[in-house]
């Protein structure tokens, strides 16, 4: 249980994990255990760990994480004064409002994972809400931009129909809290038609978790930049 207090939890493929021994679990339930119970893969599916990493790759993964999560505080730079010029895009002409809406919904527009891969020099995706599952429509993790470690949280439209489940909001909350504890700026990439409206989501507290996510984001002790990359 103590290992579950880690900021980032990594397991080797096929590793046995869990609180109670398999025999005790089976005796308590009186039912045969599902295949793969108490394995790293099962815990990953249910949002309990961040990564499954082969032993041969552990050294590189851990070294990248240490580099990203334990950067020395940057010295304060001399404040720059002046106005930021509004960027201009060559070949772009502002058209009717509906054309802009269609452009924002273009099927070939870059996704959150595309932006993350282009923005960061190194990036480690973190998985799971530590409660129920891992919503793939929310992609998040720590990366570095121009030698500055940041927490990136994006809505990935190519997964789960781009609709966010309660587990996705809880994962976002977890990453926000981790960023706050480590003093990392947060960048969010927004692109979604809305939260998943199914009954199962309601039963897992979608209304509550959306409200608490907004409350948390509005009271963070670190800077947060939100970038709208779609709808």
Feature map (PLM): residue ranges:
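Conserved catalytic cores of soluble enzyme domains
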Residues: 1-74, 190-231
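Alpha-helix initiation/capping motif
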Residues: 21, 34, 38, 54, ...
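A generic hydrophobic-helix recognition signal that picks specific residues
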Residues: 7, 87-90, 184
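Aromatic-residue hotspot detector
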Residues: 18-19, 36-37, 113, 120-123, ...
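Charged, alpha-helix-enriched surfaces in structured cytosolic catalytic cores
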Residues: 4, 38, 110-114, 138, ...
């Amino acid at each position: 249980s103590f290992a579950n207090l880690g900021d980032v939890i990594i397991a080797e493929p096929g590793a046995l994990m869990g609180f109670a021994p398999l025999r005790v679990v089976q005796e308590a339930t009186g039912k045969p255990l599902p295949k793969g119970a108490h394995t790293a893969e099962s815990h990953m599916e249910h949002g309990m760990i961040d990564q499954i990493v082969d032993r041969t790759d552990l050294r590189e993964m851990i070294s990248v994480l240490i580099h990203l999560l334990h950067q020395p505080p940057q010295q304060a730079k001399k404040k720059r004064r002046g106005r930021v010029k509004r960027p201009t895009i060559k070949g772009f002409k502002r058209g009717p409002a509906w054309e802009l809406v269609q452009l924002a919904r273009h099927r070939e527009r870059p996704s959150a994972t595309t932006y993350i891969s282009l923005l960061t020099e190194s990036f480690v995706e973190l998985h799971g809400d530590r409660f129920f599952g891992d919503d793939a429509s929310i992609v998040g993790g720590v990366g570095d931009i121009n030698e500055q470690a940041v927490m990136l949280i994006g809505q990935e439209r190519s997964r789960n129909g781009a609709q966010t489940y309660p587990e996705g909001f809880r994962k976002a909350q977890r990453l926000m809290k981790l960023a706050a504890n480590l003093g990392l700026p947060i960048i969010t990439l927004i692109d979604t038609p809305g939260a998943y409206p199914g009954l199962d989501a309601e039963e897992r507290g979608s209304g509550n978790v959306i409200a608490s996510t907004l409350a948390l984001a509005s009271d963070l002790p670190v800077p947060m930049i939100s970038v709208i990359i779609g709808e």
